[in-house]
UniProtKB/Swiss-Prot annotation:
KW Ion transport (keyword) present: no
PROSITE patterns: MRAY_1 (PS01347), MRAY_2 (PS01348)
Top-tier EC class: transferase
Alphabetized UniProt keyword annotations: Cell cycle, Cell division, Cell inner membrane, Cell membrane, Cell shape, Cell wall biogenesis/degradation, Magnesium, Membrane, Metal-binding, Peptidoglycan synthesis, Transferase, Transmembrane, Transmembrane helix
GO BP term (any one): cell wall organization
Protein name per the record: Phospho-N-acetylmuramoyl-pentapeptide-transferase
InterPro entries: Glycosyl_transferase_4, PNAcMuramoyl-5peptid_Trfase, PNAcMuramoyl-5peptid_Trfase_CS
Length: 353
């Protein structure tokens, strides 16, 4: 809408991606801050609370009455702010919005199932969830594959030229990236604000990378591929704004949890951003906390099945530190620090080619 107004009313400033990204940020922030307290009151009145896993550390039992599914609010705020701000002729931006819609549907269904049965493990069956994730990820990947100006090459940090062209196999690789990142963020969302800030730092990094990739001069200077994805930085900025508003209520002690509605959607969106910006490998550094949390689960399960011994006191790894009697705030802030430093390093690698 804003881009349309810039052309109709000749308001040139609204044609700039940076201006519309800033507007989208504040719109999403405002929508979230306005809607979230109302959602919290509604969730409390309808007992839409977070079911606590019986195996979780004892301190988690005090969170049993905390409303969940807050992700629906900030994802809605993001989509609304994006629709107001993006240029609809840019298919990459449209794809970004569709990614948010698709995976929020999965998360919503999962949250509703848990709330109805009042059981943390009673959400969608793992097989059902994987089928839905694969279906939506496949739709998004095929959509990208059909775009004429989007290549299927794999880029790695420090190299100015692509490693190789994946061809049609890129579709399957992208599906894995989206699903893996979606589930990784979901695993991380176990403490107040733990997944929120690393998501914000990752989104900020991708916003910068996407803006550079979409700019001919800047991408040429940094020896990066030039793809017309600049508009997606607007959607990413909107989600940063929405998450900033959500953090106001999600910081310790949390008044609301994002639920799978938020975590699965954020993860899938980060995967989408990594794919379109040709940063699939760099995603491992940008999303370092999500990678660490996921690896801890893989190691724990693998070790127990092979050796009947556990590597950690409990997985994901943030629970391990809880079992070692670390204060929740200490775990959260230290993970935030790691996430921030990882993203700074990731951005530095852009100059080293």
């Amino acid at each position: 809408m804003l881009y349309w107004l810039s052309e109709i009313l000749h308001i040139n400033i609204l044609g700039y991606i940076t201006i519309r990204a800033g507007i989208a940020f504040f719109l999403a922030l405002f929508f979230t801050l306005f809607l979230m307290p109302r959602f919290i009151r509604w969730a409390q009145s309808t007992s839409s609370h977070q079911p606590i896993n019986e195996w979780a550390p004892q301190r988690h039992q005090g969170k049993a009455k905390t409303p969940t599914m807050g992700g629906i609010v900030f994802i809605f705020a993001t989509i609304l702010a994006s629709l107001i701000s993006i240029k609809f002729s840019n298919l990459y931006a449209v794809g970004a919005v569709l990614t948010l819609i698709f995976f929020s549907i999965i998360g919503f269904k999962d949250d509703i199932a848990k709330i109805k049965k009042n059981e943390n493990l009673a959400g969608l069956k793992a097989k059902t969830k994987l089928i839905l994730q694969t279906t939506f990820a496949l739709i998004i990947s095929i959509f990208l594959y059909t775009l004429s100006d989007f290549n299927t090459s794999l880029y790695v940090p420090f190299l100015k030229n692509p490693l190789f062209d994946m061809g049609i196999f890129a579709i399957f690789f992208w599906v894995i990236v989206i699903i893996a990142t979606s589930n990784a963020v979901n695993l991380t969302d176990g403490l107040d604000g733990l997944a929120t800030v690393p998501s914000i730092t990752a989104l900020a990094s991708f916003s910068i990378i996407i803006y550079i990739t979409g700019n001919v001069t800047m991408s040429s200077y940094l020896l990066m591929p030039n793809i017309n994805i600049g508009e997606v930085a607007i959607v990413s900025s909107a989600l940063i704004g929405a998450l900033s508003g959500f953090l106001w209520y999600n910081c310790h002690p949390a008044e609301v949890f994002m639920g799978d509605s938020g975590s699965l959607t954020i993860g899938a969106f980060l995967g989408y951003l990594a794919i379109i910006s040709k940063s699939e490998i760099l995603l491992l550094l940008i999303g370092s906390i999500f990678v660490i949390e996921t690896l801890s689960v893989i190691l724990q399960v693998g070790s127990y099945k092979l050796r009947k011994k556990r590597v950690f006191l409990m997985a994901p790894i943030h629970h391990h530190f809880e079992m070692k009697n670390w204060a929740e705030n200490k775990i959260i802030v230290r993970f935030w620090i790691i996430a921030t430093l990882s993203n700074v390093i990731a951005l530095i690698t852009l100059k080293i080619r």
